[in-house]
Design a protein with these regions (language model features):
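Long amphipathic alpha-helical coiled-coil/heptad-repeat bundle
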Residues: 2-256
Length: 256
């Protein structure tokens, strides 16, 4: 099972509306154009019109539709309602029938040219994301890339957990296996002995060489600099600089 990397706070934030919207974002993402206004006015009733318009704005800016349209930031609600010449409180009566919300969601998707992702769509995004993970497998960055790619493809973003585990988690694991596959020819019997030795406790260091190499200096001092030089000398003595890792993207090779 792919590892979860998002905290509950992050997951909740990514699943819904932002808590607030600044003036620049209001103008950029919550301004309805002439065609938008004409489409909104095809709906009957103030509640349906303001609710539909907010779903339109949500998909346009977020790439998905929050479960509760009525939880939109108050500034956004007021701005959209003002453009429609509707009392903002009308939103409170929106979507009392689940079918209405679902119908409107489909209409908004069609209007903006979005569609729900099919399994084959997600397979394509996952393959693309695996290529990105070969360069850098930072999960938060991959999450953003996955969302941006789906937006570019006009695919409605699935739920946060689906993106986190089924896309990012699986892509990271696939990239990790691909890194190992590409590096396999480097792992000669002699080098395996060297690598295994890094996991053996060194009495002089008081820890394993692997842990010593991974430790970062806590301060910029002459002693710390000498310690880093000692690590470089240690690795040079092992012949690491002669290991050809050009089969990996430069950024990924640097991070090893």
């Amino acid at each position: 099972v792919p590892v979860r990397f998002l905290s509950d706070v992050q997951r909740n934030a990514l699943a819904g509306w932002p808590e607030e919207v600044n003036a620049e974002a209001l103008e950029r993402f919550f301004t309805l154009g002439v065609a938008d206004l004409a489409e909104v006015r095809r709906r009957h009733g103030d509640a349906n019109r303001v609710g539909w318009a907010l779903q339109l704005c949500a998909l346009r800016v977020l790439g998905f539709l929050p479960d509760d349209v009525r939880s939109a930031p108050s500034d956004a609600v007021r701005s959209v309602a003002h453009q429609l010449d509707i009392d903002p409180t009308a939103l409170g009566a929106y979507g009392q029938r689940a079918q209405t919300r679902q119908d409107h969601a489909g209409q908004v998707r069609d209007y903006l040219g979005f569609r729900l992702a099919r399994p084959e769509d997600l397979d394509g995004v996952r393959a693309w994301l695996t290529d990105q993970a070969l360069v850098s497998d930072r999960p938060a960055a991959l999450f953003r890339l996955a969302c941006a790619q789906m937006y570019e493809l006009r695919l409605v973003r699935p739920g946060v957990t689906a993106v986190e585990q089924q896309l990012v988690g699986v892509a990271r694991e696939a990239a990790r296996r691909e890194v190992y596959r590409r590096l396999q020819p480097l792992l000669t019997a002699e080098r395996l002995v060297v690598l295994d030795g890094l996991l053996v406790l060194d009495p002089d260091l008081g820890m394993t060489p692997a842990r010593w190499l991974a430790r970062r200096p806590v301060a910029a001092s002459p002693k710390a600099m000498l310690g880093e030089v000692d690590k470089l000398v240690f690795l040079r003595d092992l012949g690491v600089e002669g290991w050809d890792v050009s089969v990996l993207p430069a950024k990924r090779a640097t991070s090893l």
